[in-house]
Amino acid sequence: GRCCDVPNACSGRWCRDHAQCC
């Protein structure tokens, strides 16, 4: 998914908000 292409996508707030993409 697109959010997984973001730097550090699977850490911090981004991961909590988009956990389904990690």
UniProtKB/Swiss-Prot annotation:
Any coiled-coil regions, as ranges: none
Entry comment describing in which tissues the protein is expressed: Expressed by the venom duct. Has not been isolated from the crude venom.
Broad class of the protein's primary localization: secreted
Keywords: Amidation, Disulfide bond, Ion channel impairing toxin, Neurotoxin, Secreted, Toxin, Voltage-gated sodium channel impairing toxin
Lineage: Eukaryota, Metazoa, Spiralia, Lophotrochozoa, Mollusca
Top-rank taxon, per record: Eukaryota
One MF annotation (Gene Ontology) recorded for this entry: toxin activity
GO CC, alphabetical: extracellular region
Organism: Conus consors
Name this protein carries in UniProt: Mu-conotoxin CnIIIA
